[in-house]
Amino acid sequence: MIIQPIVEGQGDEAAVPLLLRRLRDEAQAWGLEVGRPHRKRRTQLVKKDSLQSAVRVAALRENCAAILVLFDADDDCPKELAPTLEEWALEAAGGKPCAVVMANREYEAWFLASIEALRGRASILPDATSHHEPEVPRDAKGQLERRMPRGASYSATVDQPILTAHLDLESAYRGCRSFRKLVSAFGELAVAAGVAPAVWPPSAWVS
């Protein structure tokens, strides 16, 4: 059984499968594999026709059991926009379970909630600290660069997969509502695909 991601950026192509496999392992949903992401521009993911086209392509991939659309909210409100996008996606999914998750405001906000675990990775300074409101800054990538040596820059294609591999999932869950939405959606998709997680989310994350 494969969960098929649809993403927006080059960094997401490498990072999102890593993240989903980490969630899969935490959930002990061993029968669930992660497909190669189908990438579309953000402008295409917020329009009905192009979103539905992407979902149809994903649904046709071999052994696709569920579809996850994941991209940055930017200045949009996930609570307002995501339900409409998910409705459109479900119309095109051919009966397959499908979820839309918008990282608020950017995927990198999840790193800002877990900086202590990322020290020494991708140039993150050894004394860097997490942001107290990681989903508030508009420029999460810039916030990451403030936690790097002067002159260092963040590269999504290089750094996003590295930081994803070392992200403290519990810290991201506790600090970011949109990450909690991702965790919830992942569990629901796994169940719908016939691969029920053990205890989800892990009890340690919610205690």
Annotate the PLM regions.
Residues 5-7:
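Short hydrophobic beta-strand that contains or immediately precedes a catalytic carboxylate
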